[in-house]
Regions:
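N-terminal glycine-rich phosphate-binding loop and ensuing alpha1 helix
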Residues: 3-51
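Hydrophobic/aromatic residues located in beta-strands of well-ordered beta-sheets
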Residues: 7, 48-50, 94, 125, ...
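Short, high-confidence coil segments that cap the C-terminus of an alpha-helix
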Residues: 45, 91, 119-122, 213
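Short phosphate-binding loop-to-helix
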Residues: 49, 55-114
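A conserved hydrophobic position in a structured secondary element of the catalytic/binding core
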Residues: 52-53, 104, 181, 228
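Conserved core of the sugar-phosphate nucleotidyltransferase
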Residues: 104-195
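Conserved alpha/beta core of the MobA/IspD/sugar-nucleotide pyrophosphorylase nucleotidyltransferase superfamily
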Residues: 170-244
Length: 244
């Protein structure tokens, strides 16, 4: 029987560092539409939705032909929005796709799904990229991951980890804004209170780890450019121009 795998892109208008970010035009196309189009290329997704509390975003998504689900504005996180959107749905795997990665590789989405398909004991998955640029490694806007021998994440941090005692650049990984969930665990996680490390690093995935849930990572050599501030739009446009 074919699995129902739903990719959901949580999206809100009022980003603190970049208000209106989902509707920012990137080479003539709203960013949220670019994210949807990339997600729709993933072979392992059955459906792609956008979960938002903003009618402007919903209208833009629906105009592009994709599905938008309205969620309450009181929800504080993307995880909460996804859990709400899927609360009455029967799905096998859920993928949380960040709305600020307009060149997200479809292969990365498929990799997150594949981790959960291979091992039914794993409740949550993600994707990391080998990190070789020291400036990115030092950048607090770039989230780093340290992995165990089986690919399970030991920690996520904005700090440059692991720390090489003898100096130089260590074997490091950059975390992509992408998660796969078992639907039951997603609903549980959304109901948990924020945890100390989550609040310290401002990284929601640490809530799962602090509650004893293993997050398994797939390592993929793919491109990933997150749009955090307006200047990042130019980086994405330069990448798209170079790729043509």
């Amino acid at each position: 029987m074919k699995l129902r795998v739903v990719g959901v892109i949580p999206s809100r208008y009022g980003a603190q560092r970049f208000p209106g970010k989902p509707l920012a035009m990137i080479a003539g196309v709203p960013m949220i539409v670019r994210v949807v189009r990339q997600a729709q290329k993933a072979r392992r997704l059955s459906e792609v939705w956008v979960a938002t509390d903003d009618k402007r975003i919903a209208q833009t998504v629906e105009k592009s032909g994709a599905r938008a689900v309205m969620t309450p504005s009181s929800l504080k996180s993307g995880t909460d929005r996804i859990a709400y959107a899927l609360r009455d749905q029967k799905v096998d795997i859920v993928v949380n796709i960040q709305g600020d990665e307009p060149v997200m590789a479809p292969q990365a989405i498929d990799a997150a799904v594949e981790v959960l398909q291979k091992d039914r004991k794993v409740l949550m998955s993600t994707v990391v990229i080998p990190l070789r640029d020291k400036r990115e490694w030092m950048d607090p806007n770039v989230v780093k991951a340290v992995l165990g021998l089986k690919g399970d994440v030991l920690y996520f941090s904005r700090a440059p980890i692991p720390h090489p005692r003898e100096g130089g650049m260590p074997k490091a990984y950059k975390h992509m804004g992408l998660y796969g969930y078992r639907p039951g665990w997603l609903q549980v996680m959304a109901g948990l209170k924020p945890t100390p490390l989550e609040l310290t690093e401002r990284l929601e995935q640490l809530r799962a780890m602090e509650n004893g849930v293993v997050i398994r990572a797939a390592v993929r050599k793919v491109e990933s450019i997150a749009v955090d501030v307006p200047a990042d739009v130019k980086k994405v446009e330069a990448f798209l121009k170079k790729r043509k």
